[in-house]
Swiss-Prot record:
Taxonomic lineage: Viruses, Duplodnaviria, Heunggongvirae, Peploviricota, Herviviricetes
Top-level taxonomic group: Viruses
Official protein name in the record: Protein UL49
Residues annotated as signal peptide: none
InterPro entries: UL49 (IPR004339)
GO cellular component term of the entry, any: viral tegument
Source species: Human cytomegalovirus (strain Merlin) (HHV-5)
């Protein structure tokens, strides 16, 4: 069988196999610009045909709105095809078209390679002909070696630093011969997934940090950090239970709680209080540390976090290898809260390149340009019926929230006078201004902070880190005397940044009809200038007679259909 020959393979044969594999797959791989790292974290997971820029506009009109740098990128755009794209797990089946293209490119390298390289690749698994299933298997081995390189050099928390080619070949010797023979004869997603689980103990998932309904961060699932009532503490770089005896006051408190609680299934009130304290701390503190020890994303649960497992770690001898035991569930909840705060959101802060875009405060009030955002699920709740497209999203059954309601609005409880999110049921609903002008004092100097923001239709604001991804946003109207918003379709991050510079803003439907309103600069009533107009008066754009105009073509702008002002007044 295939792995009988593998059992007795010398170490030199393994080295020759590794070197030949790297040489043959190097032309099929993309190494520059940290492409493998981007693929692992989700930025490079798009297929080449999906990543290509498409436009239905005439070339002249499209070039008129595009900068010189972006025009050069579009003209000379070459889709980057990497062999790791073959194992992106966004579909249930391997990409046949991509596999055929890579297989044809590999055969060109295979026909011109040296005879020693052919023997090193085929003799280890007793293959006489380079078939497509065997090519896919070799591509999988090469991809695991690339993940090992990424983990060693850049992302050690992936726990792939010990999964090199030597480790993989050693584990293949223990794989059942009939299953390996079936895999080499015909590679399927099911067989490849079984092999990956046998080798590494986890499901095959690429990108590793992709927001899916079955999140790769298994230690962050709700059923994991909300199902046990342990009291493990972090002591001497390991997780163990408290060894010191309880004080009389603590014993009295526990006894009193037990007497009054009885057998009422009230859960764990102390844990609920601790969760609320951790959530508030993570929301209010800009920086904090979550003690995770050496746990990685691919570590399996050893002992299930039980008391016996935690005690075994605490009493492990110096010569005995201690197993990785999960930290206590409150620490896992803190990690989930930290990831939620860094990944989930629907409001994007934009830089303001010119002060001539400041609005006149005469036409703004406390309810103008306000977005109601849920801090728990990250969705904007006052979009109304506006449909905004975005490819990135954290689905409802992910690790962050668990309810299954599709509408996004605010529920007001008149009995208790509480506000709830209709999507996840959380009470952590906040108001964020899409445009604001705040006066501050820094180091004795009076300063003005300008906030210009964009609102997404989904809760994956981290999609802005992918400069090739197109999405829909809601922006404040570019007119200085308007408190309405516009919907911008199919915008990317480079094009979104140009919308905050002078002369490139989009106007709402009301301003496009020619409705004119005076600002403080045009008013003749002798009233003092507002803060925005006072700053605009000092800009070079105003002195030189600059007039804010609508951006030319390329971006479809429509007024929001939910209300006359895009985002409803709050």
């Amino acid at each position: 069988m295939a792995n009988r020959r593998l059992r007795h393979a010398p170490h030199t044969a393994t080295d020759e196999f590794h070197q030949a594999l790297r040489r043959l797959f190097a032309p099929l791989c993309v190494h520059e610009d940290h492409f493998h790292v981007q693929l692992v974290i989700g930025r490079g997971a798009l297929q080449p045909e999906e990543a290509a820029v498409e436009t239905s506009q005439p070339p002249a009109q499209f070039a008129a709105q595009t900068s010189a740098v972006l025009q050069q990128q579009l003209v000379h755009h070459v889709p980057r095809s990497c062999v790791l794209h073959l194992f992106v797990t966004d579909k249930r089946f391997l990409n046949r078209e991509l596999g055929d293209r890579l297989y044809q490119r590999f055969l060109r390298e295979w026909l011109v390679c040296r005879q020693a390289e052919r023997e090193a690749v085929t003799a280890l698994f007793q293959r006489m002909v380079m078939t497509k299933p065997y090519f896919v298997f070799l591509a999988y081995v090469y991809s695991m070696d690339c993940l090992h390189t990424v983990a060693v050099r850049t992302m050690a928390f992936l726990r792939f630093e010990r999964y090199d080619t030597d480790y993989l070949l050693r584990r293949l010797r223990l794989y059942p011969p009939e299953r390996l023979h079936a895999l080499l004869d015909g590679v399927t997603v099911s067989l490849l997934g079984d092999l990956h689980r046998f080798l590494f103990g986890v499901d095959l998932r690429l990108p590793v940090l992709h927001p899916t309904s079955s999140p790769c961060l298994a230690l962050l699932r709700a059923k994991r950090f909300d199902a046990r009532a342990d009291l493990a503490v972090y002591h001497r770089n390991q997780w163990c239970h408290q060894r010191q005896p309880r004080s009389p006051q603590l014993r009295g408190l526990i006894a009193a709680l037990r007497r009054h609680a009885g057998k009422v299934p009230c859960g764990n009130p102390l844990y609920v209080l601790a969760r609320q304290a951790v959530q508030t701390f993570c929301d209010t503190c800009p920086r904090y540390l979550v003690p995770l020890r050496a746990l990685g994303l691919h570590d399996e649960t050893r002992g299930g976090g039980s008391t016996a497992a935690a005690a075994a770690v605490g009493h492990a001898g110096a010569g005995q290898q201690a197993h990785h035991v999960e930290p206590t569930k409150i620490v896992l909840f803190a990690l989930s809260a930290a990831l939620r705060g860094g990944l989930i959101g629907s409001v994007i802060d934009l830089p303001l390149w010119c002060l001539c875009r400041l609005k006149c405060e005469r036409h703004l009030d406390a309810r103008s340009l306000v977005a109601v955002v849920c801090r728990q699920c990250g969705h904007c709740l006052n979009l109304g019926k506006e449909k905004l497209h975005c490819q990135q999203n954290f689905p409802l059954n992910s690790m962050f929230y668990y309810r299954d309601r599709q509408e996004k609005s605010v529920i007001f409880n008149t009995h208790a006078e509480l506000v709830h999110c209709s999507l996840c049921g959380s009470q952590r609903v906040v108001r964020q201004r899409v445009y604001e002008l705040v006066s501050e004092t820094l180091f004795g100097q009076r300063c003005v902070r300008v906030g210009w923001k964009a609102v997404l239709g989904l809760n994956a604001a981290c999609a802005v880190y992918d400069h090739r991804l197109a999405f829909d946003v809601i922006l404040p109207c570019a007119a200085r005397t308007c408190d309405s918003t516009v919907v911008v379709r199919g915008v990317t991050v480079p094009r979104l940044l140009r919308l905050t510079s002078h002369g490139h803003g989009l106007l709402c439907a009301r301003c496009q009809t020619g409705e004119y309103r005076d600002s403080c600069l045009e008013s003749e009533d002798g009233a003092p200038l507002c803060r925005g107009c006072a700053l605009v008066k000092q800009t070079a754009c105003h002195v030189g007679g600059h007039i804010v105009q609508q951006a030319r073509g390329g971006l479809a702008a429509t007024s929001s259909s939910s209300s006359p002002h895009g985002l409803p007044h709050v």
